[in-house]
Amino acid sequence: GLAKYIHSMYNRNMKFSWNPKKAVENLKKHKVSFEEAVTVFYDPLAKTALDPDHSKDEDRFILIGHSSKSHLLFVVHVYREDSETIRIISARKATKSEKKDFEEL
């Protein structure tokens, strides 16, 4: 299953950033734009978890929730130093097992 979830509320004043090259690669590989991924942060039922397996130099987090296009997305992100900016690392559609875990929480 997915890591234990952290309950967190995102707010409307969030700022987002990402590497433009990575955004293009992500869209080609996963067919999910970072612009769509941003909309998951406004899903009140989205769940956030620490991603300890991929957090060597900084704390990475996983967000799973529904986008404005009703896709269940798995979004990897970090908080920048100012803690108001969220940097998107990757975004993809959730797998069947992730969807099942999400629905059980």
Question: What do the PLM-derived regions correspond to, one by one?
Answer:
Residues G1-L105:
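Ribonuclease/tRNase effector modules and their secretory precursors
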